[in-house]
């Protein structure tokens, strides 16, 4: 008997001037299916809808000069207030290169502690500092590089958090054996055929001996991690 999910487990409210960018995850794949099942809920709040000038602009020149434009305080503030008003105990997250760099253990902590998240997706040269100082609870970065906006970073976080929610991914074991779950990279995986272009699947995987397979996979994970991400080994041991 299939389990039914009668209430949303987590809600994401997204502040963005480009909500259409999110159709890639809301309409397709595992996240799209989770939305249809009502396991997760995603809403959008466009700052342009809160702009009070006839051009619906949401940016302005920075005080003190400098290149580019900043997202203005008022449209962002009003969008955040509406996003927060939809539920209680909301956490407001700003996606920024200045934020704490996101790791798998942070994703797990966010899922446990935060059930209602507002993501602020910046654009241009960033947002008015007063929003960060007075409206943002946490700043997160997905890596030490610059994107044109926070939308892709928000999608990364939504995907990473959502896939840990019961019912989003059918096979629990797939999550338990993912890369980084135990601070190790994944082991090599193979599918049919057994031999292609003179390349064979390792014999141990065809043996049916589950203990030997488990040991082989552990050795491969350790070896791959040591070669490609030795920092993970040093952190753990």
UniProtKB/Swiss-Prot annotation:
Keywords of the record: Cytoplasm, Methyltransferase, S-adenosyl-L-methionine, Transferase, tRNA processing
The keyword Methyltransferase is assigned to this record: yes
GO molecular function: tRNA (guanine(37)-N1)-methyltransferase activity
EC assignment: 2.1.1.228
Catalytic function, reaction form: guanosine(37) in tRNA + S-adenosyl-L-methionine = N(1)-methylguanosine(37) in tRNA + S-adenosyl-L-homocysteine + H(+)
Root EC class: transferase
GO CC annotations, alphabetized: cytosol
InterPro entries the record matches: Alpha/beta_knot_MTases, tRNA_m1G_MeTrfase_C_sf, tRNA_m1G_MeTrfase_TrmD, tRNA_m1G_MTases_N, tRNA_MeTrfase_TRMD/TRM10
Compartments it resides in: Cytoplasm
Pfam families per UniProt: tRNA_m1G_MT (PF01746)
Residues noted as binding S-adenosyl-L-methionine in the record, renumbered to the chain: 122, 142-147
Domain of life from the UniProt record: Bacteria
GO biological process terms on file: tRNA N1-guanine methylation
Family per similarity comment: Belongs to the RNA methyltransferase TrmD family.
The protein's assembly and partners: Homodimer.
Functional description taken from the UniProt entry: Specifically methylates guanosine-37 in various tRNAs.
Name the UniProt record assigns to this protein: tRNA (guanine-N(1)-)-methyltransferase
Species of the source: Buchnera aphidicola subsp. Acyrthosiphon pisum (strain APS)
Higher taxonomy: Bacteria, Pseudomonadati, Pseudomonadota, Gammaproteobacteria, Enterobacterales
């Amino acid at each position: 008997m299939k389990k039914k999910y009668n209430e949303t487990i987590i809600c994401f409210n997204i502040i963005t001037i480009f909500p259409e960018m999110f159709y890639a995850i809301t309409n397709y794949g595992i996240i799209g299916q989770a939305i249809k099942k009502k396991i997760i809920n995603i809403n959008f709040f466009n700052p342009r809808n809160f702009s009070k000038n006839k051009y619906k602009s949401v940016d302005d020149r920075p005080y003190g000069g400098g290149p580019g434009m900043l997202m203005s305080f008022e449209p962002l503030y009003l969008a955040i207030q509406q996003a927060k008003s939809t539920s209680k105990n909301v956490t407001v997250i700003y996606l920024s290169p200045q934020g704490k760099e996101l790791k798998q253990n942070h994703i797990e902590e966010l899922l446990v502690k935060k059930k209602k998240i507002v993501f602020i997706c910046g654009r241009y040269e960033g947002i008015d500092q007063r929003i960060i100082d007075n409206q943002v609870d946490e700043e997160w970065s997905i890596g030490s590089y610059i994107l044109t906006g926070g939308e892709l970073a928000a999608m990364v976080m939504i995907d990473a958090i959502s896939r840990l929610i019961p019912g989003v991914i059918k096979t629990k074991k797939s999550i338990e054996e993912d890369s980084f779950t135990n601070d190790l990279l994944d082991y090599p995986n193979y599918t049919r055929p057994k031999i292609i272009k003179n390349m064979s699947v390792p014999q141990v995987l065809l043996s049916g001996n589950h203990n030997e397979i488990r040991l082989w996979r552990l050795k491969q994970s350790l070896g791959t991690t040591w070669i490609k991400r030795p920092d993970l080994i040093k952190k753990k041991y």
